[in-house]
């Protein structure tokens, strides 16, 4: 489902999510109770996040198959205000084979110094647990990136979503690998950081154990409350129905 939630105004939200109904990414306008109406769709891409750069450019980051290399890569492009069109698409240059499953779900965030950082899930081989890595843009344009050294988190955490990135005060949500289902269901977790590179993870899940929860996205309502949208599914292997859920994250 890979939802991405953004604020339009005090009454309206825009929600992007992968949808079988539109055979791509559905673009919906919603109220704050998440009553939504689809406005259109985006094709041949997945895992979209959109930020506004320091220069005031509305820039999206997403996964797409590169037909020239037959590999998946993270791309960036300039997006229209309504989120229904884009231009000037450019690959970031971190490709993987198209059948690499445990890779992707990039999350882009504008960091306090005006640069852009993109986080995504990575595996060193087909069997090891996932790791979270990142790259930071060379300039405020958010087009050319260099890998950040090391890992943000290891041991199977995935679907990283930064919900706050301020000087000395970072907050993020993430999910856990599906590899150990149903014994260990996918759940959401919370972490904090001072610089967005070294993270302190609270290892206690923040979602109920009996279901699986993943792909979180969110916006602040105020200093302590965040409106969260994510994907959820029964804690079983094989084909299963995926839905979007909404929740309020209340910080201590």
Which residues does each predicted region cover?
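Beta-rich carbohydrate-recognition and catalytic domains
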Residues: 1-47, 51-102, 109-158, 163-211, ...
């Amino acid at each position: 489902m890979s939802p991405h939630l953004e604020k339009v105004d005090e009454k309206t939200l825009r929600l992007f999510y992968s949808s079988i109904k539109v055979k791509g990414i559905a673009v919906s306008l919603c109220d704050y109770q998440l009553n939504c109406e689809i406005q259109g769709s985006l094709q041949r891409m997945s895992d979209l996040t959109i930020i506004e750069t320091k220069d005031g450019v509305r820039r999206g980051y997403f996964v797409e198959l590169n037909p020239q290399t037959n590999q998946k890569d993270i791309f960036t492009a300039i997006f229209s205000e309504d989120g229904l069109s884009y231009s000037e698409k450019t690959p970031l240059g971190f490709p993987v084979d198209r059948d690499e499953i445990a890779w992707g779900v990039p999350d882009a965030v504008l960091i306090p110094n005006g640069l852009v950082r993109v986080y995504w899930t990575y595996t060193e081989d087909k069997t090891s647990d996932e790791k979270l890595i990142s790259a930071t843009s060379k300039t405020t344009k958010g087009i050319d990136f260099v890998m950040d050294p090391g890992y943000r988190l290891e041991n199977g955490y995935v679907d990283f979503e930064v919900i706050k990135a301020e000087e000395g005060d970072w907050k993020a949500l993430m999910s856990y690998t599906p590899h150990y289902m149903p014994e260990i269901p996918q759940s959401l977790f919370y972490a904090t950081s001072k610089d967005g590179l070294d993270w302190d993870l609270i290892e206690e899940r923040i979602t109920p154990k009996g279901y699986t929860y993943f792909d979180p996205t969110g916006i602040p309502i105020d200093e302590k409350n965040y409106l969260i949208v994510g994907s959820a599914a029964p804690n079983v292997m094989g084909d299963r129905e995926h839905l979007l859920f909404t929740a309020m994250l209340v910080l201590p």
